[in-house]
Amino acid sequence: MMPLYLLGALAMSLCIAGLIEFQLHNRSLSSIPLRIHVNGTRGKSSVTRLVAAGLREGGLKTFAKTTGTAPRVIDPEGKDRIIHRLRLPSIGEQVRLLRYFASEKPDAVVIECMAVQPQYQWIAEHQMIKSHIGVITNVRPDHLEEMGPTEEDVAYSLCNTIPNEALLITAEDQKPDILKAVAKQNNSQVVCSDPTSVSQKEIDLFTYIEHRSNVAIAIDVCEKAGIDRQTALNGMHKVKPDVGALVVWDLMIKESTYKFVNGMAANDPVSTLGIWNSINDRYGLGKKTCIFFNSREDR
């Protein structure tokens, strides 16, 4: 049995190591002038890419990190770097990446929240990132096992990433009052993005189908960072879409053309219906529409 003094020495060593790690992390954060933390149910990866593209177009040296369908680091040139993990995903990954970003002396970092459990979402924002601008894209009935069981519970869980004495930008239209109340408690201002402010012409310039709400959020974030709307949009229209982005392919089969819509990244009923309506408005869905449904084992 280990003597008590050895246990005490070990505990003291761990405490000292933790304090040193904490100080080093705070030093890394202080080296990043603008930190943007993106959370929400749907569209986190797309908004992260759009914001980073708008900031780059405005001349800010920007790093971004997505954690969606395929995790990526996006460098200041807009190039994707695949994140190779040797173990299961952990929010500790964010600390290591922030340290790397800080060493590159960026003007801004845009980082997607990778935490699901409510307590880890709080840690991700209030201990790890301490953002200047927080984003909650929307609140939808997803991850109900961890954040539910109700949509209201999901809203409160996502509110764990609302920053203190900073700014929250959201396009949430179902539970906005919850977000505003928590932001007020945190002494943070709220900007509600308006999807109708984005024209169809601006949407049509994307190489894939982007949601108006995502673009509206990204424009508001960029404007708060000092980038004008048109400059930000110019950058967004050049963005490389996330792997899970809504893409439509034309398939030629026996001299007939079929449209295949990849909407499988939307894994909650509300978002799936939204995609259905969007595609119906754009292309029209007749009797010859076929649905491929991908059901996860844990759903």
Label the predicted regions:
Residues 1-39, 46-53:
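Short, basic phosphate-binding NTP loop
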Residues 26-32, 53-134, 138-155:
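ATP-dependent carboxylate-amine ligase catalytic core
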Residues 72-74, 119, 174-179, 298-299:
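Short, charged/polar "capping" segments at the starts of alpha-helices
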